[in-house]
Amino acid sequence: MKVLSVSSEVFPLIKTGGLADVAGALPGALNPHGIETKTLIPGYPAVMKVIRNPVARLEFADLLGEKATVFEVEHSGMSFLVLDAPAYYNRTGGPYVDATGKDYPDNWQRFAALSLAGAEIAAGQMPGWQPDLVHVHDWQSALVPVYMRYAPTPELPSVLTIHNIAFQGQFGPSIFPGLRLPAHAYSMQGIEYYGDIGFLKGGLQTAHALTTVSPSYAGEILTPEFGMGLEGVIASRAASLHGIVNGIDDGIWNPETDPMIARTYGASTLKDRAINRKQVVEHFGLDDDDGPIFCVVSRLTWQKGMDLLASISSEIVAMGGKLAILGAGDAALEGALFAAAGRHRGRVGVSAGYNEAMSHLMQAGCDAIIIPSRFEPCGLTQLYGLRYGCVPIVARTGGLNDTIIDANHAALQAKVATGIQFSPVTAEGLLQAIRRAIYLFQDRKVWTQMQKQGMKSDVSWGKSAERYAALYSRLVSRGA
């Protein structure tokens, strides 16, 4: 089977979050199932700089008003189709925002162009390769099934994965002519959304199957609390909705082979984590004592619960804990966390921005990772924590609920606990969870058992890839 995947970011070419990890790892996990995937991605400067020996496969003289070329290239064992459209993607900022952190005003056009290019490839316009199915990710490529639905060519089966329904790609109605869709596409059954244009909403209406990244989140987005205004649309497609938990790429996230950490180790050599811990201590300027180091690797936003963490930093320090924080996001939250580091030198350290190598080192050297998200479709950092023996402390929501076994009395007695869950998602709830963690950490036998149990957990893509392969097969055999 041949699959066209369309994503606005893919690791290792370009990454701003977990979407890139998933889009980068799933194709390889599907290979053993006889599924050949080519991934269409925008030609951002960071992408164009690293690709080698690109082969031009498709030319667009007028892709929503601009010239573009699709290049095929092999990189890191994956097959990519890179949409080189300098007018859209050759920007000095990031994939979605400029150097000042503001959304590009033409994001609608940039990602509609990506979607239209995907629909053209799906329609057989790229010589020598015809996909059997299209898999798109989030709002940035959600118009692919919309363009296919309204095209004169036969429609391919399509899958839309919702990684985070909070990001919907909503724009004013004035952009509609620029999308070059027929007039009747601007309707409740199409992309119209309360008078505006909804990219994700259009994809939800037209994709043949919908997936999201955990079973719990699939249920949550059917409710007003988590559906972000789209719960009605999703409820109307509930029979086509599947919750499939993400996995991690064991070739990249493996403490036994990881080149980004100071000392590799396994479940039988946990003492070697001390070398990594020492480097974390040095990087963040922390006191080198026996107290637990709690780490955070996250966007610093309200959704991620970073305001809760900032509000209890003094209490964590008073209990003997230390904090190592890596991330960027809301300026006020960044300021609050840096202020905490200033008040508690040697106990709280903050490193602004995102650093892939440092994120690996923190998982390999810290004792626990804190993930207090108010909602979390799946989450990957808790899976990395399991794999690296960095015990997850998580809010009981979404994929965090599906992937972590809470250290309650029964789970500890049965030796199956892998982390600590808390609810409600409040500052007091988080503080109680950290208090439990510090209590358990004092019994090194219990803590080590939790680490080893987490490291034994199957967090690979194996089972999830089987579910995707089965879904693809059903759709292709049924036809669009």
Curated annotation (Swiss-Prot):
<dbReference type="InterPro" id="IPR001296">
    <property type="entry name" value="Glyco_trans_1"/>
</dbReference>
<protein>
    <recommendedName>
        <fullName>Glycogen synthase</fullName>
        <ecNumber>2.4.1.21</ecNumber>
    </recommendedName>
</protein>
<comment type="similarity">
    <text>Belongs to the glycosyltransferase 1 family. Bacterial/plant glycogen synthase subfamily.</text>
</comment>
<keyword id="KW-0808">Transferase</keyword>
<keyword id="KW-0328">Glycosyltransferase</keyword>
<comment type="pathway">
    <text>Glycan biosynthesis; glycogen biosynthesis.</text>
</comment>
<dbReference type="Pfam" id="PF08323">
    <property type="entry name" value="Glyco_transf_5"/>
</dbReference>
<dbReference type="GO" id="GO:0005829">
    <property type="term" value="C:cytosol"/>
</dbReference>
<dbReference type="GO" id="GO:0009011">
    <property type="term" value="F:alpha-1,4-glucan glucosyltransferase (ADP-glucose donor) activity"/>
</dbReference>
<feature type="binding site">
    <location>
        <position position="15"/>
    </location>
    <ligand>
        <name>ADP-alpha-D-glucose</name>
    </ligand>
</feature>
<keyword id="KW-0320">Glycogen biosynthesis</keyword>
<dbReference type="GO" id="GO:0004373">
    <property type="term" value="F:alpha-1,4-glucan glucosyltransferase (UDP-glucose donor) activity"/>
</dbReference>
<dbReference type="GO" id="GO:0005978">
    <property type="term" value="P:glycogen biosynthetic process"/>
</dbReference>
<dbReference type="InterPro" id="IPR011835">
    <property type="entry name" value="GS/SS"/>
</dbReference>
<comment type="function">
    <text>Synthesizes alpha-1,4-glucan chains using ADP-glucose.</text>
</comment>
<dbReference type="Pfam" id="PF00534">
    <property type="entry name" value="Glycos_transf_1"/>
</dbReference>
<dbReference type="InterPro" id="IPR013534">
    <property type="entry name" value="Starch_synth_cat_dom"/>
</dbReference>
